[in-house]
């Protein structure tokens, strides 16, 4: 007779119990995002990833083929969610009101980032290294950049926004997100864990960009 203890030994390391509920794809990708954010791409092993996902030790190899392919799937999913939310905000406002569209998109971007601090941590980590992974991230960001850039250009041309380069606008909008991705430091400065301050942050950023 096979005992429960024997069955547990035979499952092997990293393999979930046979009757354990499997996470859905969104949960798998979210757990992967958290693992890459907390441990770093180079430091985390495939075995650690599978354990963090709650899957068997061959899951990533069987489903994605490699750690790199899994990382790409994780980042594609996370950035797509942000892109969809910000693009929807852009499209909600009247096409002729560029200022309202830009304001709505910045607010939506900060709100989306506040809910996804692990995404910002991964991007910050990769942004300091000239690598194929950074090039891949930039490609994923391109649809949102392509949608927002014409609005930015028109507002600069008409004098509503300060006459600044596009790259400066990008960093002015994105770098304050450290408040969400660096939660332990923000906590030391007195930011409550349940703070709902993304709207205030957006207002401060926009006020600094408007003429």
Where are these regions (language model features)?
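Short amphipathic alpha-helical elements of helix-turn-helix/winged-helix folds
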Residues: 31-35, 112, 176
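Short, basic, alpha-helical segments at the C-terminal edge of helix-turn-helix-like DNA-binding modules
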Residues: 76-82
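Short alpha-helical scaffolding segments that buttress acidic/His motifs in well-ordered protein cores
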Residues: 106-109, 123-126, 173, 177, ...
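Short secondary-structure transition hinges
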Residues: 111-149, 153, 167
């Amino acid at each position: 007779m096979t005992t429960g203890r024997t069955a547990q030994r035979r499952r092997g390391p990293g393999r979930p119990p046979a009757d354990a509920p499997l996470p859905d794809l969104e949960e798998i990708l979210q757990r992967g995002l958290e693992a890459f954010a907390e441990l770093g791409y180079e430091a985390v092993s495939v075995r650690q990833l599978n354990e963090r996902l709650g899957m068997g030790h061959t899951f990533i190899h069987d489903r994605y083929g490699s750690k790199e392919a899994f990382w790409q799937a994780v980042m594609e999913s996370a950035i797509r969610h942000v892109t969809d939310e910000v693009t929807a905000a852009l499209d909600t406002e009247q096409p002729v009101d560029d200022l309202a569209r830009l304001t709505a998109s910045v607010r939506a971007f900060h709100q989306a980032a506040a809910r996804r601090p692990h995404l910002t941590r991964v991007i910050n980590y990769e942004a300091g290294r000239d690598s194929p992974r950074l090039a891949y991230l930039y490609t994923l960001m391109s649809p949102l950049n392509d949608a927002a850039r014409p609005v930015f250009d028109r507002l600069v041309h008409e004098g509503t926004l300060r006459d600044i380069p596009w790259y400066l606008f990008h960093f002015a909008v994105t770098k304050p997100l450290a408040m969400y991705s660096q939660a332990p430091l923000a906590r030391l400065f007195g930011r409550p864990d349940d703070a709902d301050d993304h709207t205030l942050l957006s207002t401060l950023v926009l006020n600094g960009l408007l003429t």
